[in-house]
């Protein structure tokens, strides 16, 4: 490695901040502690990077995730050693599951103390090995710029993911008068970006034979910013589109070719189309169990083409006839530049449209506020243009089903790991990254109690998110499963008492409201148009279930709770 002599000596912490700034990083989410004191001392006088002080390391990680998920930019977090680093584990695992580009600096004890059970020592490199795309422990101060440059490249290319840099305290404090050249030389890491042209031609050849084609749009379409190409392909060949949870927004919910989200809580039309299709083209979707149901019966009469940046995902769950490794945007562009093939999907489109129209959304009730009505009204008030953040649970599925999404990266949620507590900090990160966009958070009373301490920073950093808590006095999704599959034994899923959430909001200096009247709900919710941090608690029906529902292990056509029009 080539050495570069510095004009003046610099500490490791100076090199961290300067390298990040040179790579275009302008925001860090973090929480200080002993092992990162040299870095925070450098942050004190450093210009060009804004530091957001969270209230818990898990919160910092989810804030960085919200920042990254809503923009596609790298999210950066800093935590101290030992408990600071272990508190960050959930956020790192969540980012790995959802392919979120994160760079996480963990403090570490001095090099001489590593492996000797020093105060606040934890083997974070070993702990995070299964839940990171890559991780480093820096052993020389001069190596910091090279390691960071490599780490950013790894986190943001190919299939994005989290990279951890473990930084011993003395490495960050020591001065050096030279650095190793900060270049990227990774011969063993060469992600395939350009799809194979012959495989693209095979897709079109098979498409020409299809009578019932379906496009599946996963989160990879958003990450590749390929929504325009996806829609163009669907419109060119009149192919109906089903999305995964993380694929929501890649095609507008109002588009006539959109059938809805597929899978466990997917729409009737989407699940039936995936069952009956004879040719499925999946783009940026990993075929997780929440989408496929029983994999043995999933699309069992279909040929399957699978486009994915990660070759490890192709054929992992579902047998694939036409594998295509490469960037989703480039693959779709190639499909659009090839000569047009001829097919007639008129009868198929007529059939799936009928399926779409024969199902009513939900039964309206007069005496209780229904969560679906809340989300629909927020959709109207925000004109379907807000960044929607959710926590995890029933409200997450209702938000996926009933908000009128229009754009990619519009839904920010914890998909693969299903992390309760994700919502509040992720909404903060999304708003900091998108100050000119409305950011609305839907959260349950369970998840809200896990990370609500992050509300403390809303006024400090002027983050006017709208927190809408759908309060059903329970862990709603757990309760739903207990009522459906455990003979109604709601073991430890109902809250016998709850704190006064209105007082909590007041304690944080946040404008707060509580609504429980279905007759005035439409008018009540108009308060969200004010540009201030806001907490809205809505008491909703305590018995509402998310429907339709495919029971675990069942096939997608075996949906429960489908309500047809008379």
Predicted segment positions?
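Active-site nucleophile and cofactor-binding loops and adjacent substrate-binding regions
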Residues: 31-33, 52-62, 77-84, 139-140, ...
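Generic enzyme active-site microenvironment
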Residues: 164, 306, 389, 442-443
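Phosphate/pyrophosphate-binding active-site segments
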Residues: 2-7, 142, 301-394, 503, ...
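N-terminal alpha/beta PP-like core and its mobile active-site loop of ThDP/TPP-dependent enzymes
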Residues: 2-341, 377, 381-384, 457, ...
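Active-site diphosphate/adenylate-binding microenvironment
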Residues: 13-17, 21-26, 39-43, 353-430, ...
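Thiamine diphosphate
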Residues: 119-120, 314-317, 323-325, 329-333, ...
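Conserved structured core elements
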Residues: 224, 271, 326-329, 368, ...
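A general structural motif
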Residues: 57, 116-117, 190-202, 262-266, ...
